[in-house]
Regions:
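Non-catalytic interaction/Regulatory regions outside core domains
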Residues: 1-133
Length: 133
């Protein structure tokens, strides 16, 4: 049975390792989420793959907070703000949906959750739930 859009709302409610979790379509429309981000920030975040050097240099902004980007891959961008043990991580994943356009997952997380756990979980969720939309 393929996951459906309604399943995303349940998923967001059940996930407990993230401080924020939201899914977007290629237009930046929210599919499901635990918060509402500023549309101008969402547009920049979803454009993180446009120019790698620009994204790494500028970082990402979410709810007015600046996050340094320290990893940039074809399907993942992630980083953090603050210092180890007292900061917050951010991760964005993109996967192609059924129609070939990208869908996105965005998370933030805090210690004791580390990027190794949070980002691998984000990637798993995006592959399972967003590729079928």
């Amino acid at each position: 049975m393929e996951p459906e859009e309604a399943d995303l709302d349940d998923l967001v409610e059940e996930e407990d390792i993230f401080t924020r979790l939201v899914f977007y379509n290629h237009k930046g429309d929210t599919l499901a989420g635990s918060f509402t981000a500023d549309p101008s920030e969402v547009a920049i975040i979803l454009g993180a793959w446009d120019v790698r050097d620009d994204t790494v240099a500028a970082g990402l902004y979410l709810e007015g907070e600046h996050y340094e980007v320290h990893r940039w891959y074809y399907n993942l961008v992630y980083g953090r703000k603050g210092i180890a043990g007292d900061g917050e991580g951010i991760g964005v994943c993109r996967v192609k949906g059924k129609d070939g356009s990208y869908n996105y997952g965005l998370v933030t997380y805090t210690y004791p959750i580390l990027s190794a756990r949070a980002i691998s979980r984000l990637l798993h969720l995006c592959k399972k739930y967003l590729t079928v939309l």
